[in-house]
Amino acid sequence: MSEPILIDLHCHLLPGIDDGASDENATVDLLRKEEADGVRAVMFTPHFYYERMGLDSFAENRKAAYSVAVKACQREGIRVAAKCGAEVHFTPALPFLDLSKLCFAGTHYILVELPTNVHPAGIEETLYSILQRGYTPILAHVERFPYVTENPALLYN
């Protein structure tokens, strides 16, 4: 029987792009730990806040940080495959964005982070619109949202 392949689908390891790795050295250290723990692939998911940064600027910054991370892994002999996605903070504007730039690379899966304590207006309509466009929202940190854990049916409306 072959060993299972571990994949980290939600990490903040790109250098200097959000609250994860502060620089290239931190990225290398964290990816070495991932590799030592048996992780063979990662999906870099830096935070995207529509209200703070335009989508194109975000995509360019992520691409630059990704390039630095990949080159560092090659230089250091780290054998962890890496792709990009994003952890997208909920906004009612989501259905109007080019979501392909935010999805897990090569997929239609989009990682969405909801506000922690406030049930956002329009959540049902926004998630439904995303689904109608052919994308599948994946909720990050669902355990943090009392309005979801207390009423899971909310997500099925």
Indicate residue ranges for each PLM-predicted region.
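An N-terminally biased module of ancient metal coordination in phosphate/nucleic-acid-related enzymes
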Residues: 1-78, 156
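Extended substrate/RNA-proximal surfaces in nucleic-acid metabolism proteins
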Residues: 53-157
